[in-house]
Amino acid sequence: MSDLVFYDVASTGANGFDPDAGYMDFCVKNAELLNLAAVRIFFLNAAKAKAALSRKPERKANPKFGEWQVEVINNHFPGNRNNPIGNNDLTIHRLSGYLARWVLDQYNENDDESQHELIRTTIINPIAESNGVGWDSGPEIYLSFFPGTEMFLETFKFYPLTIGIHRVKQGMMDPQYLKKALRQRYGTLTADKWMSQKVAAIAKSLKDVEQLKWGKGGLSDTAKTFLQKFGIRLP
């Protein structure tokens, strides 16, 4: 009869996960540790961190970005992909979204242009840069190229979604990668609600994205050389 006895198991997804609550918890725990230098190092090395974690079977890891060390759930190792992730657990993907929002908060909460310039010169988005998009396109658009920003569609004005839509339309991305964004809330609105109530806002966001100067031609030789140091080679 033992083969007919069943027990509940932990969910393998983040059902009930509230990104806003997760972000606030993250900020409270890391308020005294976060700085632009550490965030810069994270974004320039996130892809390398994922690759390194994919070779390590440990369920948890403690990568260090500059002087900032953080515990993450390692869901990149093939055998760990179905492990449960708690609401306040951190993954590289969640960290990417949280840190992008943290940078935007720092930018918007400070009216000092010298501070804006410091942020623009310190934080580099390799994904945006490789598409010819820079800070001059606006902080929300520039930061929305970071993975994880789809968790905050309202904060980033739908750009994480509409950047994805544009890339799919141009054959630059498989439609399946839109799934994460299409499951997210917009503020308090569930996906089925904002898909019907926010059509005009999404259309405006998409228009902004389509008007960007897409393409690798927007990069200077200096920028291309810099990105090569981090494994991004452009023609």
Curated annotation (Swiss-Prot):
Q: Name one Pfam family in it.
A: Bunya_nucleocap
Which cellular component appears as one GO term in the record? Answer: helical viral capsid
- Gene Ontology biological process: symbiont-mediated suppression of host gene expression
Main location class: virion
InterPro entries on file: Bunya_nucleocap (IPR001784), Bunya_nucleocap_C (IPR043011), Bunya_nucleocap_N (IPR043012)
Positions of RNA binding? 18, 47, 50, 75-76, 81, 94, 124, 126, 129, 167, 177, 183-185
The molecular function GO annotations come to:
RNA binding
**Which keywords accompany this UniProt record?**
Capsid protein, Eukaryotic host gene expression shutoff by virus, Eukaryotic host translation shutoff by virus, Helical capsid protein, Host gene expression shutoff by virus, Host-virus interaction, Ribonucleoprotein, RNA-binding, Viral nucleoprotein, Virion
Location of this chain's protein in the cell: Virion
Gene3D superfamilies documented for this protein: 1.20.142.20, Bunyavirus nucleocapsid (N) protein, C-terminal domain
What's written under domain? Answer: The N-terminus and C-terminus are involved in homooligomerization and play an essential role in viral RNA synthesis.
The record's comment on protein family reads: Belongs to the orthobunyavirus nucleocapsid protein family.
Protein task: Encapsidates the genome protecting it from nucleases. The encapsidated genomic RNA is termed the nucleocapsid (NC) and serves as template for transcription and replication. The NC have a helical organization. Seems to participate in the nuclear relocalization of host PABP1, thereby inhibiting host cellular translation.
Q: How does it assemble?
A: Homotetramer. Binds the viral genomic RNA. Interacts with host PABP1.
Q: What is this protein called?
A: Nucleoprotein
- What lineage does the source organism belong to? Viruses, Riboviria, Orthornavirae, Negarnaviricota, Polyploviricotina
